[in-house]
Swiss-Prot record:
Gene Ontology cellular-component terms listed: Golgi membrane
Membrane-related topology note: Multi-pass membrane protein
Family: Belongs to the TVP18 family.
Key words of the record: Glycoprotein, Golgi apparatus, Membrane, Transmembrane, Transmembrane helix
Cited PANTHER family: CALCIUM CHANNEL FLOWER HOMOLOG
GO terms (BP aspect): vesicle-mediated transport
Coarse class of the protein's main subcellular location: Golgi
Protein name (record): Golgi apparatus membrane protein TVP18
KW Isomerase (keyword) present: no
Biological function: Golgi membrane protein involved in vesicular trafficking.
Known glycosylation sites: 23
Organismal lineage: Eukaryota, Fungi, Dikarya, Ascomycota, Saccharomycotina
Membrane-spanning ranges: 28-48, 50-70, 96-112, 119-139
């Protein structure tokens, strides 16, 4: 029980610290992490339509999986991925590239409304909000920051990327 409390305290403490910094890139990151869950859940929920919305629901699921790697970069180290994909994901390491990435994802999901109004509009709204946060961070010349959540309790904090210990080796065979 104590371990669960420690993890919860570290997560919510990091979340609280992130919002105190008033940096729009952190807001964009948190909106994007929430959007991952929306993409997967609503993509699966809308896959049962019997029209072309199925295409957009599959695209939504794929978008959610790609956003996981964009927002949680330590997964690039532990998952066996091609160097091409890894280099593609690393191109979005800044406010302006992420703004464009999320804007493109939003446009794709807004296009799903031309076929039928479904719950995919929620995904489009959240992609638009994430893009707007990164655009505001760029416009205000705010530094691109990563979350300071410390799930491990090591006190190192600083970026979801830093949470993988050095003992993890990317083994692609």
């Amino acid at each position: 029980m104590a371990l669960g409390e420690t993890i919860t305290q570290n997560v919510f403490g990091g979340l609280s610290n992130d919002f105190k910094k008033k940096n729009f890139s952190l807001y964009g990151q948190w909106i994007s992490i929430f959007t991952i869950f929306l993409c997967i859940a609503l993509g699966i929920a809308n896959i049962f339509h019997f029209n072309l919305v199925i295409i957009f629901s599959v695209i939504c699921i794929v978008q959610g999986l790609i956003v996981i790697f964009v927002e949680v970069p330590f997964l690039l180290r532990i998952c066996p991925l091609t160097d091409t994909f890894t280099n593609f994901i690393r191109k979005f390491d800044g406010n302006l590239p992420r703004c464009g990435f999320y804007l493109l994802n939003a446009v794709i999901q807004w296009l799903s409304c031309t076929l039928q109004a479904t719950s995919l509009i929620v995904v489009a709204i959240f992609f638009t909000l994430a893009s707007a946060c990164y655009a505001l961070a760029y416009a205000k010349n705010q530094e691109y920051l990563k979350s300071s959540i410390d799930v491990t309790g090591t006190g190192q904090g600083g970026a979801l990327e830093a949470q993988v210990g050095e003992h993890v080796v990317r083994n692609v065979l």
